[in-house]
Amino acid sequence: MAIFSRMMRKILLLPLLSGLFGFGIQSGLQVEPAGRQLKEFYFSLDVEHLWIAGSHVNWETGAADKPEATAGNHTHCSAFVAAACKRLNIYILRPPDHGQLLLANAQYDWLASPAALEAGWKPVEGIYPTLYETAQRLANQGYVVVAICKNPDEKVPGHAALVLPENASREKLEDAGPALIMAGTHNHRMITLAAGFKSHLPGWPEHVVKFYCNDRKPF
């Protein structure tokens, strides 16, 4: 009888523990209803056809606007992040408060400031791989999560992206990090952290990307 009772306690604890850590025994992290709405919103921005590298763009719409421009044409990762956040009524450093040039580096610094805290941004805490699990879980719950790194050379762009709500296993997160949607040299509606930040990472697991979550759910 005692052995049966211990077995029953273990069986009852399994779903509780998997719920606490956000992972089902088989299914991994799942996208919740608010996360599905956020994912649909991100996809509606059509990042694969707007905010295209090599063209000067209207930062809010991503449409090319100055064909004769010779500056501000490189990539538009931080402008895409800023535009998405603005449409969700969430403030992150953006024009006209800072120009598009080197905006990701400036956003990286700003997100660690009291102004960012007042705007609802908080750092996602943790170490590899728990940090990736937490960032993906928050996005899956419908929170806006930014992945960002600053270039050691402040005259060279950093990189910024949004964590995309997506079902994920612990193994997948350990191997490649959270799912992202991003503009860059090539724009992607879905790409892993390892692939999307590849040119900025000295190795894997990496320790240069920071994650910030806004405390207001858009949906």
List PLM regions with ranges:
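Aromatic (phenylalanine/tyrosine) cluster motif
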Residues: 4, 21-23
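...with weaker cross-activation on analogous glycine-rich loops/strands in unrelated enzymes
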Residues: 99-185
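Positively charged n-region of N-terminal signal peptides that target proteins for export
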Residues: 1-10
